[in-house]
Regions:
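Non-globular targeting/processing and membrane-anchoring segments
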Residues: 2, 86-93, 98-141
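Structural alpha/beta surface segment adjacent to cysteine/selenocysteine redox centers
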Residues: 5-10, 14-75
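Low-complexity, compositionally biased segments
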Residues: 12, 65, 81, 131, ...
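Glycine-rich loops and low-complexity Gly/Arg-rich segments
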Residues: 30-32, 53-58, 82-84, 121-124, ...
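Thioredoxin-like thiol-disulfide oxidoreductase module
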Residues: 66, 74-89
């Protein structure tokens, strides 16, 4: 049983890199494919609260529903933005990782390192070749 959960989109490079960093620490997380199984209202509100952000900070802006619904306008309340994310899960930014050390929107993917309970177990390179963990498991800054 795992204490780490990732809200994951396998089509997203940042999400894939985040999952790989979790696995590089020796943890197999619970994986929620959030586009197939989106969070319900209570879960989404709890995630937003746990991250200490407002709904707008979780909103993806480079997807069609964002423009179509005019979500760039500041007139929308958090409740209205949450409703939009529930109706169009593609609007939920990702990956979101929940761990005993916190909940984060892991953009960039290295943000997950701050909430992993276990150290990295060796070198890690992102899909684009960028080295973020050295062969000793230490973060490269």
């Amino acid at each position: 049983m795992t204490d780490i959960t990732i809200y994951h989109n396998p089509a997203c490079g940042t999400s894939r890199n985040t999952l790989a960093l979790i696995r590089n620490s020796g943890i197999e997380p619970a994986i929620i494919l959030y586009l197939e199984t989106p969070p319900n209202r209570e879960q989404l509100k709890a995630l937003i609260s746990a991250m200490g952000i407002d709904a707008r900070a979780l909103l993806r802006k480079n997807v069609e529903p964002y423009e179509k619904l005019g979500l760039a306008e500041e007139r929308f309340s958090d409740e209205q933005l949450i409703e939009a994310m529930l109706n169009y899960p593609i609007l939920i930014n990702r990956p979101i990782v929940v761990s005993p050390l916190g909940t984060r929107l892991c953009r960039p993917s290295e943000a997950v390192l701050d909430i992993l309970p276990d150290a990295q177990q060796g070198e890690f390179r992102k899909e684009d070749g960028e080295k973020v963990i050295d062969k000793h498991g230490n973060r490269i800054v």
